[in-house]
């Protein structure tokens, strides 16, 4: 309890969001969880992925629109989608192409199930695209619906993840034109600490 209280007060998280409406309604109006003792039958993976597919695209699309609203650049040549809380085929990349009316020739890359560092990997790929083609306009969008994967067992990992992670999306446009205003990507470095692999493990 002391560890959890410390993490809660030191986390710096003011607001957490969820695509699950149950948290604001009485049990009689729940849509995701069964209004039964013990929440049984507990939502299975199929239901979680169904909710992911219904909500992830909308969140990602809104994040991209907000990103484009802050720049003169409107042309997207490359699309990188990032997520580890859901996937399907056809995937999020195809859905976003249709929502954004992107040409079918748009270069698409999907980064799935890499976890918290996936956004850095996406930036690395976008940087490589831009160095190869100075006319590249790479849209990165990350979307995670963590609350869909809530587990009711009272383990430290489950409690910690429920405390830290929620639902949301963010987008960034990476371009090769250095004359544009904005942040610059200088270089990347990564390494793997073998003894700590289990610290960020997650299996379906």
Residue ranges: model-predicted function:
Residues 34-42, 54, 58, 83-136, ...:
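Conserved catalytic cysteine-centered active-site region
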Residues 63-76:
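Phosphate/pyrophosphate-binding loops at sites that engage ATP/ADP/AMP, CoA/4′-phosphopantetheine
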Residues 77-83:
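Short glycine-rich or small-residue beta-strand-to-loop segments that form or flank ligand, phosphate
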């Amino acid at each position: 309890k002391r560890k959890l209280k410390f993490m809660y007060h030191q986390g710096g998280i003011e607001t957490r969001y969820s695509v699950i409406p149950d948290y604001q309604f009485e049990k009689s109006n729940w849509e995701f969880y069964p209004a039964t003792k013990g929440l049984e039958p507990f939502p299975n993976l199929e239901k979680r992925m169904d909710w992911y597919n219904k909500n992830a695209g909308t969140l990602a699309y809104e994040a991209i629109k907000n990103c484009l609203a802050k720049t003169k650049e409107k042309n997207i040549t490359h699309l990188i989608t990032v997520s580890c809380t859901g996937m399907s085929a056809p995937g999020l990349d195809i859905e976003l192409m249709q929502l954004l009316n992107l040409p079918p020739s748009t270069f698409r890359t999907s980064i799935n199930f890499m976890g918290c560092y996936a956004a850095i990997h996406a930036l690395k790929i976008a940087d490589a695209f831009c160095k190869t083609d100075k006319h590249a306009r790479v849209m990165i969008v990350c979307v995670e619906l963590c609350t869909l994967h809530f587990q009711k067992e009272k383990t430290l990992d489950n409690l910690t993840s429920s405390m830290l992670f929620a639902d949301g999306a963010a987008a960034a446009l990476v371009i090769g034109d250095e004359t544009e205003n904005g942040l610059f990507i200088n270089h990347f470095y990564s390494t793997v600490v073998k003894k700590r692999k289990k610290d960020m493990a997650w299996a379906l």
